[in-house]
């Protein structure tokens, strides 16, 4: 495949794989790579059975982490489809972000695995492998788009639920993991296109070479 398209395609796949790999680790191991982040400006909300007030909570792939007013950080146990319950200061009102909203976050590591396969295939210059790399890149892009849609749904639901807590002022924002997923989707889309265009260019160059070769043989026969 033409190096003009091959090298950028491999770079796009490598960058997408690294970003998705980091997002797949996420909380509780990489606490900066969450999808939705809630900051509380007043009131004394608490999480689960904890009684110490918190000022922030983050939602990641495998767990959530919260920060108490004294700066102490705690995280839930790491597993898929975790649930979070947040109480108001009097522990009379509460909201829950259930497992149905976090179960789909496991699509991120699936997209990471598919991206890794596409990356390995893209390292070959064989026509069959480059075609497979292009197709699998688009598959990884589709899975990443699904993961991003799940991130959007989680963010919207968290924002909706936090607004239902009486006496608690909160601000819900998208977090780094949210945007890294979007960037990964764009990179995978670019990678699939560059690999596909590179293969198309190789076919055109091969056809041109064959055409000139046939004309040369025809001229030699005439003279």
Model-derived segments and spans:
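Intrinsically disordered terminal tails
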Residues: 1-52, 191-223
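Juxtamembrane helix-break-helix junctions at the cytosolic face
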Residues: 120-132
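Juxtamembrane membrane-interface segments at transmembrane-helix boundaries in membrane proteins
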Residues: 1-2, 89-104, 164-178
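Membrane-embedded alpha-helical transmembrane segments of multi-pass integral membrane proteins
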Residues: 15-26, 111-121, 140-150, 184-194
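Juxtamembrane loop segments immediately following a transmembrane helix
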Residues: 142-179
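Hydrophobic alpha-helical transmembrane segments
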Residues: 59-62, 175-189
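A surface-exposed beta-alpha-beta supersecondary segment
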Residues: 20-23, 29-103
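Interfacial segments of alpha-helical transmembrane regions
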Residues: 9, 129-141
